[in-house]
Amino acid sequence: MKNLDKYLSLLNEEVDGLLLTSRYSRHYGAEFDISEGVAVVSKKGCRYFTDSRYIESAENGIKGFEVLPINQFTGFIKRINDAIADFGIHTLGFEENYLTVGELMSYEKNLNAKLVPFNKEINGFRGVKEEWELDRMRKAQEITDKAFADVLPRIKVGMTELELQAELIYCLYKNGGQGLSFDPIVVSGPNTSLPHGVAGERKIQEGDFVTMDFGVLYQGYCSDMTRTVAVGYATEEMKKVYEIVAAAQLAGIAATKAGVIGKEIDAAARKVITDAGYGEYFGHGYGHSLGLEIHEAPNPNPGNPNPMPLGAVCSAEPGIYLPGKFGVRIEDVTIVGENGVEIITKSPKNLIIV
């Protein structure tokens, strides 16, 4: 089934049209990425609106939609209302998670159809990947693995976190990345206790841990990985914590397969860390799904009481963070299968000393 057909399957007498405003839903439905635009989906026709900066690309790349230009400065309202009239739409399902209050107020005031929140339905399909999507994600992760191998010998005592971040970004693009899936996290020494720390002017020192969390975009799909490496040497405590995190990740991976409740996967990994006495230092979830966005649903974390579906792609990233001392996180990306997972991150997970 084509992605657009999945959207059409949502339509009924109660919701007879969809308003796609997020880049991600438009990309999914049209199977082509345009950064600016709006699309209307109905059983009587589908239209995609974008401005002069993107119209040629849209006309050449988008399939299944009639592509029409809009004036960049006057917006989408007239085009949407024309579609509402031409297709006889009475109720538009919209993505409430991707609209500002101002945008929603404008649509409610000016559109000639009833608007109903429909984000869960519109974006629910993305939790299960088609094989062609998985191939793109495997390629994205392959690029990320190559970048990690390339950046390791570039880590030097005396360089700043920002300098290492620049080297990492270069390696990501050099190996085929078409964009960054998020701003890389590069932290060192005591800054590694900050799960989402920001690279700064701190200079890397002998005996530091360095944590790098990074990913690329490939044909619109994200990769994600984290590795913590030691510079010069690692203390016994550093080695101990690293091994606990590695064991927790393995426990989470072993617990993951289609049908297992998301929070139970988290619990399997969390138990290893808690039993080792570090439970209070693991504050975030075990993982998250990813695809067109770096954070999607469903998630293998404590807040998910639902089973993980076959074909979901999710991260496995437990961590321990000791304030003022150091932190460790190890992250791989996995594809959920019937009897386990396919780990598409291929970089080594043993403690690397550079």
What are the residue ranges of the model-derived segments?
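Active-site neighborhoods and metal-handling regions in enzymes and metal-associated proteins
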Residues: 1-354
